[in-house]
Every structure is written in structure tokens, then in C-alpha cells.
């Protein structure tokens, strides 16, 4: 039986401008699907996405849940579209406060949003709640981009008893792109949810910046990939020190190396 891979991407072209992250957000799921694996793909519904041009539409049966972050209700809206020239369907996580009326991770003046940490938390919980509703059980969950970095932590704590994710292995791709600002003093308390308890956050700095977020992702991942050159050496060293399986940058022709890494993390069993 073909492996099932859930891709949780920060960016995917053509919905947002071409960057290393958005290109990888398209190319990796496409190559994995072409290799015969079953996939699902998620990204935030950034405010700069043209819904009409991208032919996004809301999925009513998946929308409407309220996610509470810092004692405030935020409504989860799910939209979906298909990437032209491919059979890839993309699910978008949307919310009026966090995404619809914003740009991406920075505003129109280039300033990073102060609540980017909360946005990452909402995105993580939104994805996981939606996958549960889809009744689709992934074997591998591959997180690309720091906006998805909370997901490994939640999978191994708050969602560890969920049948949907019980047997899944988590892979985190580290990129050189990183925010300059930290995620605010409240991040460590905001991320607490169900079994994702505050005691698990005690070992991380109160000034929760990109490196701390990266360490959090690594600590709860089953494998880590160096997705391009220039990844923070502190994070690669952290993965090595924690003895988390690490795939060093395999070059631009990456698919064979990624497929072998998937097999290492989640070996195929004979039916």
C-alpha cells in the first residue's frame, strides 16, 4: 500500500510569489505524488492570495470551528483549490483576524507582525483539526517553513492519542529563511493546549525566537531535513546532539534522497 504523506507548507507557488519556500511547497508534493504516494497539502490563506484567480472556495463542512488562543475565540475557515497543470489539491487555513486582512509574515511596510507566533499556533491547530475531519490517516507528516514548526510539538503531546495521527512520523524541513523578531513573551503560554502542557516549555528561553522555535520542532520530530544551504548551524547541531535522524542538503535533485529518508523514518511494510 502506498504511503500517505501530509504536507504542511508555509508557502506554495503559484498562490504566493516564487521563493525557495513556495517553490519547494509546490515541487516536493508534486514529485511525491508522481512517485505514487498519496498526499494532502495545507498552507495558510495569506491575505495577498487572489481567491478569484486561484479559484479558492470555502468548504462549509470543514469550516466553523472556534479555536481558543489566549482566551479569545478565533473562527477556523477552510478553503480549497487545485493547482493548475497538476492534480494537487491545496487546503487553505483562513481566519479574518490572522490571515484575511494581512499580508504574509510581514506587513506592507516590511515589518514582521507581532502576533506571528499566535498565527503559527492557529495554523498548526487548524491543520490538525481539519485532517481529523477528513478522516484521512497520514503515515508521514512533512512540515516545511517555520510557520509549521509548532506542529511536531502538538502531534507528540496534545494530539498523541488521536487515532488519525497515532502512527504518523513527523519530518521537519529547515530552511535558511527566518524571521528577525522573536515571537513575544506570551508565546510559551499561548502554545499550551490540552496535553501540550507548560512543563514541556520550561527548557526553552522566554525570549522565544526563531532558533527556539526550530529547536522545539526538532525535539518533537522523527527526522530533520536541511532543505537548502545557509540553515542556522545551531539548529543542525541541535538535531545532531539530540540524535534526531538528519538528512543534510542533498542538492537540487533531491527526490531520491527524500524518498530514501522517508523510507528510513517510516519503513514500508509488506501487505
What are these regions (language model features)?
Residues 1-271:
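Catalytic cores of nucleotide-sugar-dependent glycosyltransferases that transfer UDP/GDP/TDP-activated
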Amino acid at each position: 500500500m502506498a504511503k500517505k504523506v501530509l504536507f504542511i507548507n508555509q508557502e506554495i507557488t503559484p498562490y504566493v510569489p516564487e521563493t525557495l519556500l513556495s517553490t519547494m511547497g509546490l515541487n516536493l508534493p508534486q514529485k511525491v505524488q508522481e512517485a505514487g504516494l498519496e498526499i494532502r497539502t495545507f498552507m495558510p490563506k495569506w491575505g495577498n492570495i487572489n481567491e478569484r484567480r486561484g479559484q479558492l472556495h470555502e468548504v462549509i463542512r470543514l469550516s466553523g470551528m472556534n479555536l481558543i488562543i489566549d482566551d479569545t475565540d478565533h473562527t477556523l475557515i477552510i478553503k480549497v483549490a487545485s493547482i493548475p497543470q497538476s492534480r494537487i489539491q491545496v487546503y487553505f487555513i483562513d481566519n479574518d483576524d490572522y490571515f484575511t486582512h494581512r499580508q504574509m509574515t510581514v506587513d506592507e511596510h516590511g515589518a514582521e507582525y507581532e502576533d506571528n507566533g499566535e498565527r503559527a499556533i492557529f495554523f498548526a491547530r487548524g491543520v490538525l483539526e481539519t485532517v481529523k475531519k477528513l478522516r484521512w490517516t497520514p503515515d508521514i507528516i512533512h512540515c516545511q517553513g517555520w510557520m509549521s514548526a509548532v506542529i511536531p510539538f502538538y502531534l507528540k503531546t496534545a494530539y498523541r492519542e488521536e487515532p488519525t495521527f497515532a502512527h504518523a512520523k513527523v519530518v521537519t524541513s529547515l530552511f535558511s529563511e527566518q524571521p528577525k523578531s522573536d515571537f513575544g513573551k506570551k508565546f510559551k503560554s499561548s502554545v499550551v493546549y490540552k496535553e501540550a502542557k507548560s512543563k514541556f516549555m520550561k527548557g526553552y528561553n522566554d525570549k522565544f525566537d526563531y532558533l527556539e522555535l526550530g529547536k522545539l520542532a526538532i525535539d518533537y520530530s522523527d527526522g530533520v531535513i536541511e532543505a537548502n544551504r545557509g540553515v542556522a548551524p545551531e539548529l543542525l547541531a541541535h538535531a545532531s546532539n539530540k540524535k534526531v535522524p538528519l538528512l543534510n542538503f542533498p542538492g537540487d535533485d533531491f527526490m531520491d534522497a527524500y524518498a530514501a529518508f522517508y523510507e528510513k523514518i517510516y519503513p514500508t511494510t509488506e501487505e
